[in-house]
Amino acid sequence: FCLSRGLGDVYKRQTNPEAKIAYNPSGSGAGVQTFLTGATAWAGSDKALADDEVEQSKSVCTEGTAFDVPVYISPIAVVFNLKGVSDAGKHINMDAATIAKIFDGKITKWNDPAIADQNKDLKLPDTAITVVHRSDKSGTTQNFVSYFKDVTPDNWTYDLSENWPNEVGQGAKGTSGVISTVKQADGTIGYADFSQVGDLGTVAVKVGDKYNEISAEAGSKVIADSKQDDTVKGDNRIVIKINHATEAEGSYPIVLVSYDIVCPAYKDTKQAEFAKAWLTYVTSDEGQKAAQDAAGTAPLPSSLKSEITKSIEAIKTK
C-alpha cells in the first residue's frame, strides 16, 4: 500500500537517512503470510492477526508471539462509475441493506427502487450494475463485509473472511486493481481504501436518519465510538473491535484500522531496532501527521497512545 512507501521515504529523510526499506504492496493477506515465513521483519495489514496466525508466529519470533499495533485509520469507500452522476461530482445515498444487496447480486440496476427512493434528487439510469471486488485475500474485504455482518446480517449470511464470498461481479487484484477496473466501465461499483479513490464517485452511507459522506474525520468518529477487543490471544496486542453500528453524529461506519505486525524479539538486533524505531515514528504525532498528509488517513485516538507505547517498548533490542 502506497502509504507505507510514502511514510518510509519521510522516515528516512527525517529520522534515519541510512535506513533501507523495501516495501512490497502485495495486500494484507500476502503480507502477513510472507511475515509468517520469516522473510520480512514486519508486515502491514488491514486486519488483526487471527489466533492461529499468532500461534504460527512462534516459528519466526525469537521469543513470544507476534503482535499488532494500530498505525492508522482509514474509511473504506464504496466507489462507483456512473455516467451523469459520478462524473458530475455527485454522491449516491445508500443504507447498509441496499449496499449489501448490490454486492450480493440482489439489486442489479442503478434505477432500482431501493436506490431511487433514497435519491429523489437524482435521475438514475437503467444501467446494469457491475460489482467489482477483490480477487486476492484482503483485509479490506474482511473489514468491508464486517459492516454488513454487524449492521444488516439478514442481508449478508456469508461467513466472515478475507476472501470474497460469492460469484457476483468480477474480481480484481489489490486496491489498484479494483480502482482501475471501476474506472474502465460505466455502471461499475466496488470498494477501496479512501486514500485511493481519486475522482470516482462515492456512496454516502446512512447512519441513523442521515446520509454521511466519506472523510477521514467521519471515519475517526467510528473508532472513537469503538472499544478494544479483549478476546484476542497473545501479549502486547492492541486490536480494535469496530462499532459498525454506531450512530455517532457525522460518522462514516465503513472503516478499517491498519496494523503493523512485529515480533517482540528478533535474531537480528538491527531488525529489532528498526521495528521499534519505525513503530515509534509512525505512531508519533509527527508520523500520524505525515500519514494524514500523504493519504488522508485519520489520526489514532489519543486514548490509545499509552498502550501503544507500552507495546512498542516490548520489542527487545538488546
Predicted regions located by residue number:
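Extracellular/periplasmic juxtamembrane helices and adjacent flexible linkers that interface
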Residues: N119-T127, I242-K318
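Ligand-binding pocket segment of bilobal, Venus flytrap-like solute-binding proteins
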Residues: V32-T34, A41, K137-V232
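Stable alpha-helical elements in mature extracytoplasmic
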Residues: G8, G27-G31, S74, D95-T98, ...
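Pocket-flanking alpha-helical
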Residues: T15, A22, S28-G64, V78-F80, ...
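Single conserved hydrophobic/aromatic residue that forms the stacking wall/gate
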Residues: F1-Y11
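Short helix-loop capping/hinge motifs at secondary-structure junctions, enriched
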Residues: K83-I92, K109, K137-T140, D154, ...
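A conserved helix-loop-strand patch within extracytoplasmic ligand-binding domains
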Residues: E63-V131
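Extracytoplasmic
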Residues: N16-E18, A30, T40, G64-A66, ...
